[in-house]
From Swiss-Prot:
GO terms for cellular component: phycobilisome; plasma membrane-derived thylakoid membrane. Heterodimer of an alpha and a beta chain. (2R,3E)-phycoerythrobilin 1 binds at residues 50, 61. The keyword Transcription regulation does not apply. This is C-phycoerythrin class 1 subunit beta. (2R,3E)-phycoerythrobilin 2 binds at residue 82. Light-harvesting photosynthetic bile pigment-protein from the phycobiliprotein complex. The modification N4-methylasparagine is found at residue 72. Signal peptide: none annotated. Keywords: Antenna complex, Bile pigment, Chromophore, Electron transport, Membrane, Methylation, Photosynthesis, Phycobilisome, Thylakoid, Transport. InterPro entries: Globin-like_sf (IPR009050), Phycobilisome_asu/bsu (IPR012128), Phycobilisome_asu/bsu_sf (IPR038719). Its main location: membrane.
Length: 184
């Protein structure tokens, strides 16, 4: 996994040249947006437990057979494994968002995930649906579109840097889409 700074150095080194003005301008922009990026990651990690449990609950509500005898969320140990997997996926998405690079997600989370789920008999459609629900929740937290009306008793207002976060919302959404594509 290379962060934005390391990528610039590696690229310049491969060309046997100094870091160029275009790279420096891109790094300045990256630093300027740094607080928003940190706030976005904080919004995900501070709400990770709720994001994951709500996603698994939503997946089960749409497919109640998952919690019946023989279902992939029955008995409790399988439910715990499902919640654990959701937390791991969300954690690697937060790493990718922090670094601004999907390689950590690809290398350490998605590589072989589909094959593992197939071997374990995990229904790909249900797993992808849970990730889609996590995507909706996480992007709402990042974009501050989560409101008291939507969250009810679970609503929690986060202190965040002011400004447009639409680029970070789109970036985070792309990481969730990578996971969905890898599973499906």
């Amino acid at each position: 996994m290379l962060d934005a700074f390391s990528r610039s150095v590696v690229s310049a080194d491969a060309k046997t040249a100094a870091v160029g003005a275009g790279d420096i301008a891109a790094l300045r922009q990256y630093v300027a947006e740094g607080n928003k990026r940190l706030d976005a990651v904080n919004a995900i990690t501070s709400n990770a437990s709720c994001i994951v449990s709500d996603a698994v609950t939503g997946m089960i509500c749409e497919n109640t057979g998952l919690i019946q005898a023989g279902g992939n969320c029955y008995p409790n140990r399988r439910m715990a494994a499902c919640l654990r997997d959701g937390e791991i996926i969300l954690r690697y998405i937060s790493y990718a968002l922090l670094a601004g690079d999907a390689s950590v997600l690809d290398d350490r989370c998605l590589n072989g995930l589909k094959e593992t789920y197939i071997a374990l008999g995990v229904p790909a459609q249900s797993a992808a649906r849970a990730v889609a629900i996590m995507k909706a929740s996480a992007t709402a937290h990042i974009g501050e579109t989560n409101t008291q009306a939507n969250g009810g008793a679970k609503f929690r207002k986060m202190e965040t840097t002011q400004g447009d976060c639409s680029a970070l919302v789109a970036e985070a959404a792309s990481y969730f889409d990578r996971v969905i594509s890898a599973i499906a």
